[in-house]
């Protein structure tokens, strides 16, 4: 199927300021259209070959492919007993799953989407889990407040990614970790890598997960389509399908790079 001029324009805009302004309104629209009671995960699906063998509760099973992404990102380090901050937590599904299964001392989900945060606060009522509205580039927390910062997608929408990294360094305690998964178009890889290299955070691991995301999208396509068709108006249904098809195509063709990282804040970085 050929894409319309509007879709081709959005693809060319990439991560420009216009694109980022669009996404500031897209997520609240998704929240009002879908609701956290319908879709608790906004991240792309992920699956390995052979498949990840997670034991899930019955209520989590429909979200297995999205949970896989959270599980792989979060288990680079031990979360048990740690103070965890998730930046851009979406509808809170990942926060709920990780709180219930990995047992952090506390877990705070932050998002700029006011409607999304209200839904999270209503739905995900668990001991040690809380949600706050805030800006990823101006985190509303004291210095050295967290042991781990988790970031699954969305940073490609931030106007100033380097400011987010500076805020991560500020709120992490010495010896803490940034667990990070996101994607960039090929023409922005150099800038992405330069921002990461320019941060005081030290990289412990990195791997490209294009194949795993494509596999997850393919495996999850029917479930996602049913939910979207039931709950979104026609123009949003079309946009959602177009983005999914293009994402798979670009990942397979190398026009996008989807990566998973683990960073640490060395003690020297806090001096």
UniProtKB/Swiss-Prot annotation:
Gene Ontology MF terms: S-adenosylmethionine-dependent methyltransferase activity
InterPro entries, sorted: Methyltransf_11 (IPR013216), PthPhpthDimycoMt (IPR054877), SAM-dependent_MTases_sf (IPR029063)
Enzyme Commission no: 2.1.1.-
Keyword Lipid metabolism tagged: yes
Summary of the function given for this chain in its UniProt record: Catalyzes the methylation of the lipid moiety of the intermediate compounds phthiotriol and glycosylated phenolphthiotriol dimycoserosates to form phthiocerol dimycocerosates (DIM A) and glycosylated phenolphthiocerol dimycocerosates (PGL).
Family, similarity comment: Belongs to the methyltransferase superfamily. Phthiotriol/phenolphthiotriol dimycocerosates methyltransferase family.
Name of the protein: Phthiotriol/phenolphthiotriol dimycocerosates methyltransferase 1
């Amino acid at each position: 199927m050929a894409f319309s001029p509007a879709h081709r324009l959005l693809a060319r805009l990439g991560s420009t300021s216009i694109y980022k302004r669009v996404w500031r309104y897209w997520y609240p629209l998704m929240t009002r259209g879908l609701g956290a009671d319908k879709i608790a995960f906004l991240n792309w699906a992920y699956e390995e070959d052979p498949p990840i063998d997670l034991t899930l509760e019955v209520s989590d099973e429909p979200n297995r492919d999205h949970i896989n992404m959270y599980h792989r990102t979060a288990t680079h380090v031990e979360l048990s007993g740690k103070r965890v901050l998730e930046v851009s937590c979406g509808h809170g599904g990942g926060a709920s799953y990780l709180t219930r299964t990995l047992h952090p001392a506390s877990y705070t989900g932050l998002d700029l989407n006011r409607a999304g945060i209200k839904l999270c606060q209503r739905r995900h009522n668990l001991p040690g889990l809380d949600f706050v509205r805030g800006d990823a580039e101006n985190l509303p927390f004291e210095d050295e407040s967290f042991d781990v910062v988790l970031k699954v997608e969305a940073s490609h929408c931030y106007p100033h990614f380097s400011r987010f990294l500076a805020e991560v360094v500020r709120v992490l305690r010495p010896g803490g970790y940034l667990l990070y998964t996101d994607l960039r178009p090929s023409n922005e890889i150099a800038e992405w890598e330069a921002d990461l290299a320019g941060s005081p955070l030290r990289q412990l691991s990195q791997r490209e997960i294009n194949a795993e995301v494509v596999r997850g999208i393919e495996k999850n396509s029917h479930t996602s389509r049913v939910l979207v068709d039931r709950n979104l108006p026609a123009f949003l249904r079309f946009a959602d399908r177009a983005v999914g098809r293009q994402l798979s195509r670009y990942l397979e063709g190398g026009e996008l790079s989807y990566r998973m990282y683990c960073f640490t804040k060395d003690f020297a970085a806090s001096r």
